[in-house]
Amino acid sequence: MARTQQQRREETVARLLQASIDTIIEVGYARASAAVITKRAGVSVGALFRHFETMGDFMAATAYEVLRRQLETFTKQVAEIPADRPALPAALTILRDITAGSTNAVLYELMVAARTDEKLKETLQNVLGQYSAKIHDAARALPGAESFPEETFPVIVALMTNVFDGAAIVRGVLPQPELEEQRIPMLTALLTAGL
């Protein structure tokens, strides 16, 4: 059966986004040019710009795809936490593992680049704002989340995400396994003590 134009478009965009993610993981954002990414995707540079008006739009779509995958993984894994297992340390472990993954490094690369690139910063702010709202909702659905006050819950979610993001960045340069193994028990104790 012949593919429709819409199917071909979706397949091309999916290949471009995967190539962008893989390229940034492998060589970093600074060397992830349109030519390098499109070569990896097996399409022309023109094809990229038929689907995305600017490189900033394409990088925002790349960030959105990374965040979509991470949210999907987080939500799926949280739903699989056994009822007899404490939800908080299990969810923190899932968050740690996601932020430590190579795909998350794409976000770090894009956020660092956005610090000095106003257009990229503007597009990422929108994508990250949407993601923050979705991660808040996913965290709110965790068993036991209702015990945290609504007014402080967004701060707690941001704090936990930032802790693991920061740890993932530092880990690449200065691994500290002795601290790593203590992080989740310490965070769990701090969070439950505040209830």
Swiss-Prot record:
List, alphabetically, the Gene3D superfamilies matched. Tetracycline Repressor, domain 2
**GO CC list:** cytosol
Biological process terms in GO annotation: regulation of DNA-templated transcription
Q: Which GO terms describe its molecular function?
A: DNA-binding transcription factor activity; transcription cis-regulatory region binding
InterPro entries assigned to the protein according to its UniProt record, in alphabetical order = DNA-bd_HTH_TetR-type_CS (IPR023772), Homeodomain-like_sf (IPR009057), HTH-type_TetR-like_transc_reg (IPR050109), HTH_TetR (IPR001647)
What keywords is this UniProt entry annotated with? Answer: DNA-binding, Transcription, Transcription regulation
Per UniProt, residues of the HTH tetR-type domain are 10-70
The reply on keyword Lipid metabolism is: no
| DNA-binding region, residues | 33-52
> Is this entry keyworded Transcription regulation?
yes
SUPFAM superfamilies recorded: Homeodomain-like
Q: What is the official name of this protein in its record? A: Uncharacterized HTH-type transcriptional regulator Rv2912c
Give the species this sequence originates from. Mycobacterium tuberculosis (strain ATCC 25618 / H37Rv)
Lineage of the native species?
Bacteria, Bacillati, Actinomycetota, Actinomycetes, Mycobacteriales
